[in-house]
Regions:
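Positively charged n-region of N-terminal signal peptides that target proteins for export
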Residues: 1-4
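Hydrophobic h-region of N-terminal signal peptides that target proteins for export
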Residues: 7-18
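Non-catalytic cell-wall polysaccharide-engagement segments
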Residues: 17-30, 39, 77-108, 112-199
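Extracytoplasmic
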Residues: 43-48, 53, 66-69, 126
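Cell-wall polysaccharide-cleaving catalytic domain and substrate-binding groove, primarily
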Residues: 53-78, 136, 180
Length: 199
């Protein structure tokens, strides 16, 4: 009886932890709308929600020690650059602490990166996109040039810290897509189409 009760408690605890945090719920409609406007009706909204989860834990006022700001943790110069790329959608002033602006800019930046990376599978390509968002497209491109197979994330990931990026940054950069695609995304499964990965 004790084992059955313990199993039930663990099952319930697991189900609760797999839910989106309360802070995320108020942004769901905005994120779905912004993602579908850029990516279409089959937009992988759970990926984007998991990305915000990883970046800021849905804190509008989040500020990193290195200067990244807001829900999507844009660095100030990246935010300004986004307004130059997409002035009609984002206006002339970067507003990283405005949640609607941050979500709108993030899905556009993700699409911009997605168009510049390769992958044999959706997982490989989104993995590369997320690594580029976290650590810079130039670093990912340098690593992919060394890789035996540019479309395979494992082949590219092996070159982290060898090609151009300092090895000290590899753990965070390689963990970033793994957490988003294999841990956090499941919390947001009800929000839309997921990108499945084997781990």
């Amino acid at each position: 009886m004790t084992r059955v009760l313990l199993a039930l408690v663990l099952l319930v605890a697991g189900a609760v932890s797999a839910e989106p945090p309360r802070a995320a719920l108020g942004f769901r409609a905005d994120l779905v709308r912004e993602a579908r406007a850029v990516w279409g009706l089959q937009a992988p909204v759970p990926v984007f929600a998991a990305q915000v989860h990883q970046e800021s834990a849905w804190r509008v006022d989040a500020r990193s020690p290195v200067g990244a700001e807001g829900l999507a943790q844009f660095m100030p110069l990246t935010g300004v650059w986004m307004t130059e790329l997409y002035p009609a959608a984002l206006g002339r002033d970067a507003q990283p602490f405005n949640p609607q602006w941050a979500l709108r800019a993030m899905v556009r930046y993700d699409a911009w990166l997605h168009a510049r990376v390769v992958g044999h599978t959706a997982c490989d390509r989104f993995w590369a996109m997320l690594r580029a968002y976290n650590g810079g497209l130039g670093h990912w491109q340098a690593e992919s040039r060394f890789a035996f197979d540019r479309g395979d994330r494992v082949s590219v990931d092996r070159w982290c810290g060898v090609a151009r990026r300092a090895a000290v940054h590899c753990r965070e950069n390689l963990d970033y897509p793994r957490r988003i695609l294999t841990q956090h995304q499941v919390r947001y499964a009800a929000w839309g189409v997921q990108v499945t990965c084997d781990g």
